[in-house]
């Protein structure tokens, strides 16, 4: 009772119809009966209006009405006077209790249980109209008492007969009773469940305890939920009963309304409506006012919030700005303090300040390494425990079940990490399509998935973390940093006995279980006493067995040629013999080395059952049965078949997966790595590689991640950690040798347990040495011409309409050109057509390429002394050309590249390695023939072109330098001088440098002491700062020294060179060994000249029509205002210039050579051909004067007695100071200046002045103002200016009036007056730009005209210069130089003086445009010059016609004279600067 809501308890019994109550009140007369019938009719009508016809109360009301109308008795027989009975006290108490309960329910209050018991008197439901048995007994004839008297209950049967429905509604099942029974059952079950949950055992898992506690609390809240629901339902159902829903006034007697009452009612109604309307309007007004007020408050609130936020933001910004300002002040103060210490030569103080800046970074790095090593220790322990459990599980799985099981690939959702396994995972053959349709999933390695499942099943007990910083507690930051650094400097080696006794370090944690391997086991070697493992190979076997025992995977990274294959075979046989582990073992090798592995297994382990899984589909199908049965020990296959046959091979649970040339897995996302991780399950993995570190450190991480994904899981952490000492951080304060060594020693701890690497020079002492030489080759003239344009991205092609083709990958084409120009078919076609031959072969094929020319000198010497050669190429097309060369020289050779079939490779190796083989040379491609080949019968390796990856070249070298080699190995690397190949070589050396620091300096041979590793690391770091000087192309003697192995061979090679030169000298038509420029096809030369002219035209602003990229050169300018002379100085300079011209003409007549016609830069038409003279050497007097001027600067000392020029003598290298070469585009130092003086590059003093100004400007640009170098550069600039002014303006006694005239000379061509009355530099330059061309023409004609006409020209010259003596001197000097050039250049016949004068003038103009200058003024556009020439000098037209006529000279005449073309002056200077 108490568990049910109050309203349900009251409504549990069906309510009595209202008609029954009325009938009881009206039982004493017909008048009361009529009234009762009328009320019943009203009730029935009201219920019908409300649609309650189906209600049981409606049916009972109708039945009662019928009874009253038919006059049937309404009382049970024997109770006729029941209507007059008085109410009993029990009924009165029940009525009062009902009234009280109704009042409580109306107020929605709780009804007490005793009140409910008094108000509801349950009585059994009457299911029949019959009285109780023996209530009206009857008597039978024999005196027997019967239960009923039939006459007394006749009326009851009569009522049943008069019912309107003959079939009564069956009573059925009492729903109230069933509901009570159901509730009792539920309550019992709830009680039992709560009792069970209270008595749960204490050892259940935590997640089960949590679920039980949640369920128990929910069950306890059932009663509260029921009570709340009952209260809510009471509010909802209060107005839904019949008594409250019907209109109570319907039961009143209708009163007739009078007219007065109607009027009063209408009036009251109107008043009520008006009041309601007023209230509605007032309510709406109040609502609007509240909304408006709320809006105002809302806006005000948020406005205040914004103001508060703005104030807070401003306060925070002010705080950080103040902090930043203070920090910058501190930095500036410290910087000034360091500079002050440096200026005061306080080295100790400067070093202390510098260390203070670097210690923070170093301490951070050391702390990071400690944390990383500690985390790896825990990961290694966890990995070992997991692997132990996996081994136990693998033993329970039968092989047959695994083979029959349908292979499925485990995948994982990237975002959530949820893995799909079992039937939910996709099948092997459907994985590719499934991944395309589900891009959010990725393949997860089976080993890694099993690790995760193991972690979920059982949580390892967490060891309490030890506090690491206890020893530094209570110290300030500075003391703590010093303690960390001191500890790192004094750190003992981890292999020391003291360290082993103190605690288990990182290596001891990994190799906890140790097993000694003393001698070779019996199954290794097949019983042959000659097949014995070397001591270092037994050590390698012991290391691999230790990995097996400790459930780890590793990398056997011995240097190439130390027998990694044999050591791997010894591991397999050891596990089979000692550990009773018969496999299966999966060995994945490159296709080129598969036959070698097969031979080694047959030789060293004949008892091991091996399967070679390769070949066609039928061949592979023949061995599938044996594979499915597991009737083998070792299965050898290649990378391709592993990917192709993953469905078959992935079902086998391999004991060991061995991958040869493991650096194939250096890309973490490559297909091979994904397939091996996703499809294959192996207990142990082993990688074999000779180059564990190739291009980048993440590649080493990829290998470790493939082996141990649970330990090396984050590439970002690994790369960030390792790259600190190597990568450029952008900070000027770099780590010194000691600090770099401290960090690298820490990093070696990570790699040492998983990496074993021994070098041949350490373990194989009887192996002969290997020496590598870089031989620089010269370029032929054809290569130089094409290379110069190819650097701009153009390939000269006469077949193209534009004359050239744009190149996309310029570096690749430059490499091709360095190898051989005939790698471009259009170049070969042009040469073939120009030389009038069907095919270019023989010596011509060698003469066009510098590398072939060098090999033509080297190969005969090696052939004569019995050496055999391996030659490696990057391009197979170059191998085709080299084959033609070998056939021409009749050398026997073999060739192996990517197109060679796998079955043929073994035959080629057998032929070359045969004892009496006459094969001299073996051509191989670096990628196809550089792996796994044994070619130790050769002793010379020639790398024709280098690979970007230096380890590819090292692999190629070790094809000959390996176990079994008896001779000294000589490696020759061919590099084209001043080409892109030098940059490739530099990049390769940098990669090898990283390899040395990380791998080799780690000394992963498991026996080196800490002192040895520290010494080796110091040597490597010290070598970083040493940069080799640029080597020139070696001569024959130098090459012989590189190639010769002994003094005897050197003498033989020298004599062979003498014989070769003698033979070439006796040839009838002797040709130089390299192609010269007059032999280059005319179409290529013409295209080269045209594009050079286009470049000049673009620089000068002329319009050109071409399709070439717009790349402009930097032009040098001429300063015309450098010398302002008086009249006497002017006349003396004119006389000196005339003397110099006469002397130069005499010298040029003796040393005159053939010239080639070139294009004038100042002509509008690119077809105007003029003579271009070769650059002259430095005059001896000028060179002597230059040396005297430089000696003054080089010998100048500062106050401390130090030479200020020492810092500027030699610039630091690009490796030492890379940011300098990013800021300074054109570096300059005194070494470069001295080199130009020695080679005669300075023809005039202005060129040296430009270089000196460049040197000073560079120093002031890069260094800060006030620094020591900056001050020294200012001193050098002042000293040079004094020397230069003395040279240009020698001291002469000058009269005083003359000095006064000089500043008062006006500039007639300047439109802007000078403020001081003296023409400014810009005014003079503007004057020179406007009149330079006209005056040069006039001065040239003055020398060949009669005196009267020459005087007219002189007057015109004075008019144009405005009487400026300096300008007149400048023009006179230019005229003299033009006359000197005219006298030294006599290729065309001298028909008249006008033609010579015009040619000389144009040549002089071209020379003046090429001269360097530091002035900011630039020459006006050529079109303006042309216009001024046409307006001032009408004779220019006749001269131009003669010059244009000269351009029509046919090309055949130029070929007959065979002129020698040279590089332009600017090109030579740019090459020298590079």
UniProtKB/Swiss-Prot annotation:
Residues 1177-1287 form the Bromo domain. Its EC number is 3.6.4.-. Residues 86-121 form the QLQ domain. Residues 263-278, 394-416, 1293-1303, 1389-1411 have a biased composition (Basic and acidic residues). CDD domains: Bromo_SNF2L2, DEXHc_SMARCA2_SMARCA4, SF2_C_SNF. GO terms for cellular component: chromatin; nucleus; SWI/SNF complex. Residues 263-283, 383-427, 442-475, 1098-1119, 1136-1161, 1287-1326, 1382-1474 are annotated as: Disordered. Signal peptide: none annotated. ATP binds at residues 558-565. Involved in transcriptional activation and repression of select genes by chromatin remodeling (alteration of DNA-nucleosome topology). Component of SWI/SNF chromatin remodeling complexes that carry out key enzymatic activities, changing chromatin structure by altering DNA-histone contacts within a nucleosome in an ATP-dependent manner. Selectively binds the N-terminal tail of histone H3 mono-acetylated on 'Lys-15' via the C-terminal bromodomain. Component of the multiprotein chromatin-remodeling complexes SWI/SNF: SWI/SNF-A (BAF), SWI/SNF-B (PBAF) and related complexes. The canonical SWI/SNF complex contains the catalytic subunit swsn-4, core subunits swsn-1 and swsn-5, and accessory subunits swsn-3, swsn-6, swsn-9, either phf-10 or dpff-1, and either ham-3/swsn-2.1 or swsn-2.2. BAF complexes additionally contain let-526, while PBAF complexes contain swsn-7 and pbrm-1. swsn-9 shows similarity to both BRD7 and BRD9, mammalian BAF and PBAF components respectively, and may be a component of both BAF and PBAF. Belongs to the SNF2/RAD54 helicase family. This is SWI/SNF chromatin remodeling complex core catalytic subunit swsn-4. It comes from Caenorhabditis elegans.
């Amino acid at each position: 009772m108490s568990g049910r809501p109050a309203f349900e308890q009251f409504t549990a019994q069906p309510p009595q119809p209202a008609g029954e109550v009325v009938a009881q009140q009206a039982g004493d007369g017909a008048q009361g009966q009529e009234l009762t019938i009328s009320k019943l009719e009203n009730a029935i009508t009201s219920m019908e209006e409300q649609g309650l016809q189906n209600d049981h109360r409606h049916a009972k009301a109708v039945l009662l009405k019928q009874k009253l109308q038919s006059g049937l008795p309404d009382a049970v027989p024997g109770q006729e006077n029941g209507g007059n009975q008085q109410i009993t006290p029990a009924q009165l108490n029940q009525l009062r209790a009902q009234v009280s309960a109704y009042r409580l329910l109306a107020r929605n209050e709780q009804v007490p249980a005793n009140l409910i018991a008094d108000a509801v008197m349950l009585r059994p439901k009457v299911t029949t109209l019959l009285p109780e048995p023996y209530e009206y007994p009857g008597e039978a004839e024999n005196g027997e008492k019967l239960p009923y008297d039939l006459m007394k209950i006749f009326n009851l049967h009569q009522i049943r007969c008069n019912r309107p429905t003959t079939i009564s509604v069956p009573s059925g099942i009492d729903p109230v009773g069933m509901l009570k029974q159901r509730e009792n059952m539920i309550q019992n079950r709830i009680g039992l469940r709560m009792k069970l949950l209270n008595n749960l055992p204490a050892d259940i898992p935590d997640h089960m305890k949590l679920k039980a506690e949640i369920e128990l609390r929910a069950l306890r809240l059932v009663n509260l939920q029921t009570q709340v629901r009952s209260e809510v339902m009471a509010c909802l159902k209060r107005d839904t009963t019949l008594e409250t829903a019907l209109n109570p006034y319907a039961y009143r007697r209708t009163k007739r309304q009078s007219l007065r009452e109607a009027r009063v009612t209408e009036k009251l109604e109107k008043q009520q409506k008006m009041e309601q309307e007023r209230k509605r309007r007032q309510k709406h007004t109040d609502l609007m006012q509240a909304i408006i007020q709320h809006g105002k408050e809302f806006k005000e609130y948020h406005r205040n919030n914004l103001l508060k936020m703005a104030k807070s933001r401003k306060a925070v910004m002010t705080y950080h700005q103040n902090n930043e300002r203070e920090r910058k002040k501190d930095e500036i103060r410290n910087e000034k303090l360091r500079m002050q210490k440096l200026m005061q030569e306080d080295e100790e103080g400067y070093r202390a300040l510098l260390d203070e800046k670097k210690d923070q970074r170093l301490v951070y790095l050391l702390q990071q390494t400690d944390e990383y090593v500690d985390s790896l220790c825990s990961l290694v322990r966890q990995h070992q425990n997991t692997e132990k459990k996996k081994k136990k599980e693998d033993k329970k799985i039968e092989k047959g079940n695994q083979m029959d099981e349908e292979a499925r690939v485990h995948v994982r959702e990237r975002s959530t990490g949820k893995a799909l396994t079992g039937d939910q995972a996709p099948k092997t053959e459907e994985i590719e399509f499934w991944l395309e349709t589900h891009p959010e999933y990725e393949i997860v390695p089976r080993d890694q998935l099993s690790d995760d499942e193991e972690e979920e099943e059982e949580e390892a007990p967490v060891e309490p973390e030890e506090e690491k910083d206890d020893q530094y507690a209570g110290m300030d930051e500075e003391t703590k940093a010093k303690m960390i650094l001191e500890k790192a400097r004094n750190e003992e080696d981890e292999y020391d006995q003291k360290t082993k006794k103190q605690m288990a370090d990182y290596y001891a944690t990994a190799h906890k279980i140790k097993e000694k391997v003393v001698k070779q086991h019996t199954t290794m070697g097949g019983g042959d006493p000659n097949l014995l493992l070397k001591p270092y190979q037994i050590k390698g076997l012991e290391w691999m067995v230790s990995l097996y025992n400790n459930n780890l995977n590793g990398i056997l990274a011995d240097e190439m040629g130390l027998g990694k294959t044999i050591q791997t075979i010894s591991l397999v046989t050891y596990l089979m013999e000692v550990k009773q582990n018969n496999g299966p073992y999966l060995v994945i090798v490159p296709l080129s080395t598969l036959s070698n592995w097969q031979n080694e297994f047959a030789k060293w382990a004949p008892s091991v059952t091996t399967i070679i899984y390769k070949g066609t589909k039928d061949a592979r199908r023949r061995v599938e049965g044996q594979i499915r049965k597991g009737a083998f020990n070792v299965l050898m296959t290649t990378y391709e078949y592993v990917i192709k046959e993953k469905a078959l091979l992935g079902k086998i649970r391999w004991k060991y997966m061995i991958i040869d040339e493991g650096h194939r897995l250096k890309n973490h996302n490559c297909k091979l790595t994904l397939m091996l991780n996703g499809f294959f399950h192996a207990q142990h993995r082993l990688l074999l590689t000779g180059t564990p570190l190739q291009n980048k450190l993440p590649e080493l991480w990829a290998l470790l991640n493939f082996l141990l994904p649970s330990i090396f899981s984050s590439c970002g952490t690994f790369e960030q950690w390792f790259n600190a000492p190597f990568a450029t951080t952008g900070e000027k304060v770099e780590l010194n040798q000691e600090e770099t060594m401290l960090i690298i020693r820490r990093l070696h701890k990570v790699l040492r347990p998983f990496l074993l690497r021994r070098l041949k020079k350490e373990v194989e002492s009887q192996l002969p040495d290997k020496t590598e030489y870089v031989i620089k080759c010269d370029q032929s003239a054809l290569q130089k011409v094409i290379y110069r344009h190819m650097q701009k991205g153009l390939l000269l092609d006469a077949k193209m309409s534009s004359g050239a083709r744009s190149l996309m990958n310029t570096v690749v084409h430059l490499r091709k050109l360095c190898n051989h120009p005939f790698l471009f078919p259009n170049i070969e076609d042009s040469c073939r057509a120009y030389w009038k031959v069907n095919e270019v072969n023989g010596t011509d094929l060698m003469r066009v390429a510098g590398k072939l020319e060098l090999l033509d000198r080297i190969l005969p010497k090696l052939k004569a002394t019995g050496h055999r050669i391996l030659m490696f190429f990057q391009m197979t097309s170059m191998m085709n050309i080299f084959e033609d060369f070998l056939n021409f020289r009749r050398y026997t050779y073999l060739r192996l590249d990517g197109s060679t079939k796998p079955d043929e490779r073994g035959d080629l190796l057998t032929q070359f390695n045969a004892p009496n083989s006459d094969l001299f040379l073996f051509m191989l491609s670096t990628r196809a023939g550089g792996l796994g080949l044994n070619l130790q019968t050769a002793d010379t390796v020639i790398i024709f072109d280098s690979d970007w990856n230096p380890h590819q070249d090292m692999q190629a070298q070790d094809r000959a330098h390996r176990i079994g080699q008896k001779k000294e190995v000589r490696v020759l690397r061919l590099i084209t001088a001043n080409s892109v190949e030098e940059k490739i070589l530099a990049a390769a050396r940098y990669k090898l440098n990283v390899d040395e620091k990380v791998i080799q300096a780690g000394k992963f041979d498991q026996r080196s002491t800490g002192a040895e590793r520290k010494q080796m690391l110091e040597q490597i770091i010290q070598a970083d700062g040493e940069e080799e000087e640029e080597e020139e192309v070696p001569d024959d003697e130098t090459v012989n020294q590189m190639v010769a192995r002994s003094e005897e061979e050197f003498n033989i090679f020298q004599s062979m060179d003498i014989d070769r030169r003698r033979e070439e000298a006796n040839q009838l038509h002797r040709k130089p060994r390299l192609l010269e420029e007059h032999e280059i096809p005319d179409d290529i030369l013409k295209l080269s000249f045209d594009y050079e002219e286009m470049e000049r035209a673009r620089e000068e602003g002329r319009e050109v029509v071409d399709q070439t990229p717009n790349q402009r050169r930097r032009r040098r300018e001429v300063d015309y205002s450098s010398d302002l002379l008086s009249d006497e100085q002017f006349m003396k300079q004119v006389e000196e210039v005339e003397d110099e011209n006469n002397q130069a003409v005499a010298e040029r007549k003796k040393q005159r050579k053939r010239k080639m016609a070139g294009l004038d830069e100042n002509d509008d038409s690119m077809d105007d051909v003029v003579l271009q003279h070769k650059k002259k050497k430095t005059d001896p007097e000028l060179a002597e004067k230059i040396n005297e001027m430089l000696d003054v600067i080089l010998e100048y000392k500062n106050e401390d007695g130090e030479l200020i020029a020492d810092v500027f003598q030699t610039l630091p290298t690009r490796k030492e100071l890379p940011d300098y070469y990013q800021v300074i585009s054109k570096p300059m130092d005194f070494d470069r200046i001295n080199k130009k003086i020695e080679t005669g590059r300075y023809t005039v003093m202005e060129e040296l002045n430009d270089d000196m100004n460049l040197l000073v400007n560079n120093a002031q640009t890069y260094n800060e103002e006030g620094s020591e170098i900056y001050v020294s550069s200012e001193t050098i600039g002042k000293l040079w200016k004094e020397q230069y002014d003395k040279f240009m303006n020698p001291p002469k006694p000058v009269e005083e009036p003359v000095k006064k005239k000089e500043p008062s000379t006006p500039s007639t061509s300047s439109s802007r007056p000078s403020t001081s009355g003296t023409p400014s530099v810009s005014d003079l330059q503007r004057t020179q730009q406007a009149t330079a061309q006209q005056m040069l023409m006039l001065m040239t004609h003055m020398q060949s005209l009669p005196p009267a006409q020459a005087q007219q020209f002189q007057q015109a010259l004075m008019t144009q210069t405005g009487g400026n003596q300096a300008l007149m001197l400048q023009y006179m000097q230019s005229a003299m130089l033009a006359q000197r050039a005219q006298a030294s250049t006599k290729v065309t016949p001298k028909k008249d003086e006008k033609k010579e004068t015009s040619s000389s003038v144009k040549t002089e103009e071209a020379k003046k445009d090429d001269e360097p200058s530091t002035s900011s003024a630039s020459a006006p556009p050529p079109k303006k010059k042309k216009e001024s020439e046409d307006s001032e000098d009408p004779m220019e037209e006749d001269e131009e016609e003669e010059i244009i006529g000269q351009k029509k000279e046919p090309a055949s005449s130029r070929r007959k004279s065979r002129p020698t073309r040279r590089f332009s002056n600017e090109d030579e200077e740019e090459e020298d600067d590079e």
